[in-house]
Amino acid sequence: NYSVLATPAEGLSGRFTKMDRRKFGKIPGVTDRDYYVNSFHVDVKEPISIVEKIKCEAPFHAITRGGHITYVELDGEAQKNVRAIAKIVKVMHDEGIGYGSINHPVDTCHNCGYKGVIFDKCPVCQSESILRMRRITGYLTGDLSSWNSAKRAEEKDRVKHL
């Protein structure tokens, strides 16, 4: 018996890029950034719709029975648009996604406690001290400050799927 796993390899995505850059030099679109995109995922920089991303990744779920995930990135607070979430889940189901995730920002101002999507500064008190909760592939691991440099670079490059 065997199983194929679409591994996230969170630490390796940055480590292998550095090793390849040393060995092969800086290759545009390959080793010129701090990370490799995990598994069979569409490039995080690719401006693609939610449905397109799901349809592109779905065929790989059937052949990676040992584990897989498809995630989409939203630009707002998910709880404010429950119908959209339900539609995304339905598309994931209909396309055969075995494990799906809907990522959305969860930010909290350390200074005044404001919760919501915060860009550079808190909209209430202008503080730059922000707790930024994000998901790495399939799990939450604390705020961005606990992520390795490769994963922080990837998160910064992630486009929102509309």
Per-segment meaning from a language model:
Residues N1-L162:
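Long, C-terminal-biased catalytic regions of enzyme "large/alpha" subunits
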